[in-house]
């Protein structure tokens, strides 16, 4: 007889920190304070390797670790995390060996930030291959996860790095979504998505290029040229550079099609 299908454990590091398995779950209210959230998130991000105790302590407290008995304090945090995780699944635990901690999850566990990166890889691969119909789903997954806050209200260098990584995932996923919308002739949607890209990363010219294509494709060449003028001014004012040849080539084609230019802003 076939074994009954089982939902995998799901660990959400974005939004409210939560772990769930079927109808069992725990969220950050059962994690030992801000330090517990930081410990679980760091161990989850680094779960492919053992994390030295002093490295985890730095991730948990940054420069403000408890004087003297920090190892005892960290051990207490990990013990509480271990108990909460085992309440979901005996295979979920934090192992200790050779002065290191390591988060151990079932082989089929789903971690949201990992899923976002995997989905982005799939989406970009589909777009590169011209398979836009199959790119939308994974791109939407990546963009949705990456738009959620990571450890809101908590700051540290490693947290800032992960937020930057998620921001990049979100921008690239939005670009994939815009590419799909363009390929499907959904120009207003492509323009909306491209505007999100340039709002998040105003110096990323691919966002401006796709915005120009979307506006022009929707019949608004003058607005597309105004987008180019905005890009040109931004780059000149902030970076002292001119747009890339690819961006200028789009503007040149638009000017030729409209029989002139657009007022600079």
Feature names for model-found ranges:
Residues 127, 172-173, 177-265:
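Recognition helices and adjacent regulatory flanks at domain boundaries
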Residues 1-192, 196, 201-202, 259-265:
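Intrinsically disordered, low-complexity protein-interaction/activation regions
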